[in-house]
UniProtKB/Swiss-Prot annotation:
Monomer. Its cofactor is Zn(2+). Residues 1-20 form the signal peptide. It comes from the Bacteria. It catalyses: a beta-lactam + H2O = a substituted beta-amino acid. One of its GO terms (molecular function) is beta-lactamase activity. This is Metallo-beta-lactamase type 2. The gene is bla-imp13. Keywords: Antibiotic resistance, Hydrolase, Metal-binding, Periplasm, Signal, Zinc.
Length: 246
């Protein structure tokens, strides 16, 4: 049975009730040439988690910013755009966790170019996961010149977390680095570095018109400041926890 893709006007809650059937992949048009894709996966300890990524159109070419959680949803996403006359020219994964890289293996099998930083590929390899076909080491890397910039602000949610800047629309995809309501999964986080990295991001993209996070609502540039505040709070709490009792 063919599933309907819904163009929705608002984001879903980051975590929905566990045990319910997973919602279908969602696609939302943000503005001309920029779409948000939203996928869902049940994650142990977190329930059903919502994950946002982007699709950026450059003429008749389409670029995926993060894959959905699974190969199945990645294939659906690709087909949705192919059926509308677009060619998938490349994908970038913002960090090594499966909510950004879950579709890499399928994309590689379809000869769709996959990109990640060298650090992300190293972490994927250490985790026994399929790596992106192409990698880069630059702090700032143009996936498409003057259209799609990939930037490394420094460690935070993970050692390798990247953000993606769309200069024409002034949209920043902050991925899992942007955490305005709490830092979430800290399993691979660098709490010492996160506040400084957030400051770097604020300095570079403070004029962003719209900021898209992986797991929370979209908003304005204040999401970066709120992330910095959460990072400072998380660092202070971690130091209290690790301090020896008197």
């Amino acid at each position: 049975m063919k599933k309907l893709f819904v163009l929705c006007v608002c984001f879903f809650c980051s975590i929905t009730a566990a045990g319910a059937a997973l919602p279908d992949l969602k696609i939302e048009k943000l503005e001309e040439g920029v779409f948000v894709h939203t996928s869902f996966e049940e994650v142990n300890g977190w329930g059903v988690v919502t994950k946002h990524g982007l699709v950026v159109l450059v003429n008749t070419d389409a670029y995926l910013i993060d894959t959905p959680f699974t190969a199945t949803d990645t294939e659906k996403l690709v087909n949705w755009f192919v059926e509308r006359g677009y060619e998938i020219k490349g994908t970038i994964s913002s960090h090594f966790h499966s909510d950004s890289t879950g579709g890499i293996e399928w994309l590689n099998s379809q000869s769709i170019p996959t990109y990640a930083s060298e650090l992300t590929n190293e972490l994927l390899k250490k985790s026994g996961k399929v790596q992106a076909k192409y990698s880069f080491s630059e702090v700032s890397y143009w996936l498409v010149k003057n259209k799609i910039e990939v930037f490394y602000p420094g460690p935070g949610h993970t050692q390798d977390n990247l953000v993606v800047w769309l200069p024409e629309s002034k949209i920043l995809f902050g991925g899992c680095f942007i955490k305005p309501h709490g830092l979430g999964n800290l399993g691979d986080a660098n709490l010492e570095a996160w506040p400084k990295s957030a400051k770097i991001l604020m300095s570079k993209y403070g004029k962003a018109k719209l900021v898209v996070s992986s797991h929370s609502e979209k908003g304005d540039a204040s999401l970066m400041k709120r992330t910095w505040e959460q990072a400072l709070k998380g660092l202070k709490e971690s130091k209290k926890t690790s301090s020896p009792s008197n």
